[in-house]
Amino acid sequence: MLAFIFTPWVYSGAYFFAQETKNMNALWTQIAENLTFVLTCLALVVGLALLAKLAEKFLPERRTVTPARRVSIIGICAAIATVLHIMDFAVPFLAPGFYKLDFSELPVLLCGFYLGPCATVVCEGIKILLKLLLKGTSTAFVGDLANFVVGCSFVLPATIWYHVHKSKHSAIIGLTLGTICMSVFGTAFNAVYLIPKFAELYGMPLDAIIGMGTAIHAGIHNITTFVVMCVAPLNVVKGAMVSVLTLLLYKRVARPLFGIRS
């Protein structure tokens, strides 16, 4: 009689324990996957910071700026960059709606042209942190990582090349080089890591993302054609527009913002 009464409870308890174990295993798996993503982000940030620091060691002597003034300039440029980043907009005839175009690299470049490569990485990082605090993320943080890393692939080469000679001609070459680096690196990074990770973290099938691209360009049928026909043109357009604005505004903005005459 007792066995008849307690047997269902035993089976129920065992089933509940098995389900809880399964849920905990799934939770730890998700934590491990997200931890890997976080560690990847940190590794990229540290790598870019070290690259910028190394580049500065081989550049000609830069302007002497007090620490307080350096902090204030980076802070002002990062704040402006954050506002421009929040004002991003989709370009539906080029790429799916989760790809946005913004001009936040403009103040980052102005900051880098004045202070050097390290300032660009710091400015980019502060921009992303402020954006996350003010607006959060709509892309499971993948878009924020992309904006930081791909943005650095644009502003770092441009800033490093500009500081070699500090002339308008050098600025043009640097901005052109930065646009090329951003287009090539951004396209490859999207294909190899960002898009698959976005699909994984956001719970969206990869085929669905490719299908969004096919709706815009009929020639898209896999991830390679997706990044070539959607991501690359978007990066080229952004690089070209920000480059033109930087050339037009740097000297004009440098006078009131940085207090320089040349």
Give the residues covered by each predicted segment.
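Loop-helix junctions at membrane interfaces
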Residues: 3-262
